[in-house]
Amino acid sequence: MNVPHHIAIIMDGNGRWAKKRGLPRTIGHREGVKRIKEIVREAKKLGVKILTIFAFSTENWNRSKNEIKFLFQYLNIFLKNYKKELMRKDIRLKAIGRRDRIDKKSIRQVKVVEELTKNNKSFIFNIALDYGGRWDITEAARRIVSDYQNKLISKEAINEDFFEQYLSLGGLASPDLLIRTSGEQRISNFLLWDLAYTELYFPQKYWPDFNTKELEKAIEVYSQRIRKFGKI
């Protein structure tokens, strides 16, 4: 089976999963967080090298304050309880996205885990927090302009490969496979630059129901596709 080097996941459907069961949306998020570790373990076991999950978008601030509060509470608990396993399994965790709008406690917890795991090499686990693809591209352009104005780079050096280094995933291979759970078929401002040639897969399962068998199925579907990258 042809296993993708890098998988990106939009974890969609937590709220609908909870509503279907007559439960609060926050319970759906809690169950969704539980699913993350299982999928990371299975991805690593199958030979995937990088996993990037969309945990909180720049647009998610439009949700209720109570829901946002619970989301970051779950994030803090998740990171605190996950540190030992990350070290034991040689997994590096990295957060991508804005950091100026997230509460200080959450950012502090993120930094602790990033620092702790920075030398781990077997697997890279990216969590997109307060992330948006348009923001990512705009921020990269802003930083390039700043470096050019400060005479750190030349105009002639700027091309696609150079620009890519300024993005949140700079230095990492672009995703080979994007999975969006819940059946919704859109990318919702996620990794806009990086998904240019990514294979897309949209299972009907809500994220809390997306288990290891579903991941294996996604990879099996991916392995049957022929990626041409514009060639015949």
Features from the language model and the residues they span:
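Flexible, compositionally biased loop and terminal segments
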Residues: 1-232
